[in-house]
Curated annotation (Swiss-Prot):
Family in the record: Belongs to the UPF0145 family.
Organism: Carboxydothermus hydrogenoformans (strain ATCC BAA-161 / DSM 6008 / Z-2901)
InterPro entries in the record: UPF0145_dom_sf (IPR035439), UPF0145_YbjQ-like (IPR002765)
HAMAP family: UPF0145 (MF_00338)
Name of the protein this chain belongs to: UPF0145 protein CHY_0465
One Pfam match: YbjQ_1
């Protein structure tokens, strides 16, 4: 499955537009991770714990979106957008949206 943020792919033509596909994930945080993140914020470092959680959530939503596109008969998803939101005090939501398409190489 080819995934792209752009609306077109060089060397390919879209032969079928199959619809909008999404992937969603809501991840909970925990006390220890929050504590470590706040310490990193105070001393100006990066929060590896949160970065790892963001990467995990991003992988989940992209895989979920790919599976939904595959069920529609797509071999690519174009125009992908990723959104990140905090939900309440201790939850992180990641949403991926794109267009499922069937592509073929240009001749």
């Amino acid at each position: 499955m080819l995934l792209a943020t752009s609306g077109r792919l060089d060397g390919f033509k879209v032969t079928k537009y199959l619809g909008i596909v999404t992937g969603e994930a809501i991840m909970g945080t925990n006390f220890i991770r929050d504590l470590l993140a706040s310490i990193s914020d105070i001393i100006g470092g990066r929060s590896g714990a949160y970065e790892q959680q963001l990467e995990e959530a991003r992988n989940i939503v992209l895989n979920e979106m790919s599976e939904r596109a595959k069920r529609l008969g797509a071999n690519a998803v174009i125009g992908i957008s990723l959104d990140y939101e905090s939900v309440g005090q201790s939850m992180l939501m990641v949403v991926a949206t794109g267009t499922a398409v069937y592509i073929e190489p240009e001749m």
